[in-house]
Amino acid sequence: MSQEKNIDDWRIRIDEIDRELVRLFNERTQCAIEIGHIKKRLGLEIYSPTRERQVIANVTSLNKGPLDAEAVKRLFERVIDEARRIERVHSEAAAQVVTDIQAEIENTFINE
């Protein structure tokens, strides 16, 4: 029974860490969304390979194990891919809002 309790304790700890990871992933994603808005205003591309390489280099240099550098790289490549996708979605949604507002303004003036 004590070994089962030990496993349960570790699983509880993993669940706590998972909750924190989800919170941090969402916080990171919100930052990416804000960056996407800024890029849109400045006319910059969403995809920034130089920055993505910097992020990968940063996180792999921080790694002390037991994950190896390749595992950390793969994890963050996925995180970055998802952030880029969300940036793009939000950027397109913002562009659609602007288009809708412009159309509404034009319709208002045409109908007056």
Where are these regions (language model features)?
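Domain-level signature for soluble enzymes in the chorismate/prephenate branch of the shikimate pathway
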Residues: 1-112
